[in-house]
A protein has these predicted regions:
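Flexible loop/turn segments at secondary-structure boundaries
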Residues: 38-39, 64-68, 102-107, 177-181, ...
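Carbohydrate-recognition beta-sandwich/jelly-roll modules
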Residues: 1-61, 69, 73-74, 80, ...
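A cross-domain feature marking catalytic cores of carbohydrate-active enzymes
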Residues: 33-35, 59-61, 97-101, 174, ...
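Active-site and adjacent substrate-binding regions of carbohydrate-active enzymes
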Residues: 43, 47, 88, 149-211, ...
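Active-site-proximal substrate-binding groove within the catalytic cores of carbohydrate-active enzymes
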Residues: 198-299
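Active-site mouth loops of central-metabolism enzymes
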Residues: 29-39, 139-153, 270-272
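Active-site-adjacent "subsite" loops/lids of carbohydrate-active enzymes
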Residues: 79-165, 242-259, 263-264
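Aromatic- and acidic-residue-enriched carbohydrate-binding clefts of CAZyme catalytic domains
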Residues: 56-79, 110-147, 178-203
Length: 299
């Protein structure tokens, strides 16, 4: 299979040919900060004190509304967030904030103001695909990636985050993780139902971001490791590794390690950090060639 992947659109580019910033190639540790408080900033500083410069800080809960609600209305950012980014960068580390690339909350002001329903992915009966996550218990709609309105919104967010917050790029959640949905909307410019439009639409979006909006030496990355998205993103965050009733084998890195950068290995519950399992999982992460971490620094 590895040999076959070199003949595919997603597998025929080496890391060296993809213009990935050197700082990301050199990165060996990521932390996941949640919130913009003195406690969080103190934990980040303590982590940098211990591990040294060059840490990647993946920032969550920086936006105006609670997590997994009111997407894509992230602005205004919390007042202290720009200063937090600056502090991280002055310590010769890098900060990349979270946005979601797939969900639109129907309770968001923008959903009404911009007619978000027109961008929503539609089932055959015309109803919406909806999802509720335990982090918020709020209903979100799945947006069709072929929607030109959605492209405009995501690109606008990428521009605003870089221009106003001066980050080292943007993380766009779920794109490389969530399965495509058949869409029967008549206004999105694709054939009704399933097809490769899902991937091609996200490719067009990310290609536009990379070609016209991503600042020099900034990165864009996404969740999980669906192989068709490998060349679109500078890095893939692999954190949904299953554990129950299975044995983990490093199939993905065996096939793709020379063409993709991955970060992390699994979610790390708070209770596990002081246990042997945490060390074992980090050992697996290291052996499988993934950049270490994605652990809350306050732990």
């Amino acid at each position: 299979y590895r040999l076959f992947t070199f003949t595919c659109e997603w597998g025929n580019k080496s890391l060296q040919s993809r213009n990935i910033p050197q700082w990301l190639l050199d990165k060996d540790l990521w932390i996941r900060s949640k919130g913009v408080t003195d406690t969080v900033m103190a934990a980040i500083n303590k982590t940098i004190d211990f591990f040294g410069e060059g840490i990647g800080v993946h920032t969550y809960y920086w936006h105006n509304y609670p997590y997994d609600t009111h997407y894509p209305d992230y602005f205004p950012a919390k007042p202290e967030f720009e200063g937090m980014i600056s502090t991280i960068q002055k310590r010769k580390c890098h900060a990349v904030p979270y946005i979601n690339g797939r969900l639109w909350d129907p309770a968001a002001d923008s959903y009404t103001a911009l007619n978000g329903a027109s961008a929503s992915c539609r089932k055959a009966d015309g109803t919406l695909y909806t999802e509720i996550y335990p982090t918020s218990k709020v209903l979100n709609t799945v947006t069709c990636p072929a929607s030109s309105l959605w492209h405009k919104i995501i690109i606008g967010l990428v521009d605003k985050i870089q221009n106003e917050l001066h980050t080292n790029g943007v993380y766009i959640d779920q794109i490389a993780a969530a399965a495509p949905q058949p869409c029967f909307a008549k206004n999105h410019g694709h054939a009704a139902g399933g097809g490769d439009f899902w991937y091609k639409s996200y490719k067009a979006l990310i290609d536009s971001i990379r070609g016209n909006h991503l600042r020099k030496d900034n990165i864009v990355f996404s969740e999980e490791n669906s192989e068709c998205y490998i060349p679109l993103f500078d890095m893939l965050l692999t954190v949904n590794t299953p554990h129950a009733n299975c044995s983990i084998v490093p199939l993905f890195p065996t096939v793709y390690s020379d063409r993709v950068i991955t970060c992390a290995y699994t979610y790390t519950p708070t209770a596990d950090v002081t246990k042997g399992e945490f060390r074992y999982q980090n050992m697996q992460c290291f052996l499988y060639g993934s950049q270490l971490g994605w652990v809350d620094p306050t732990l």
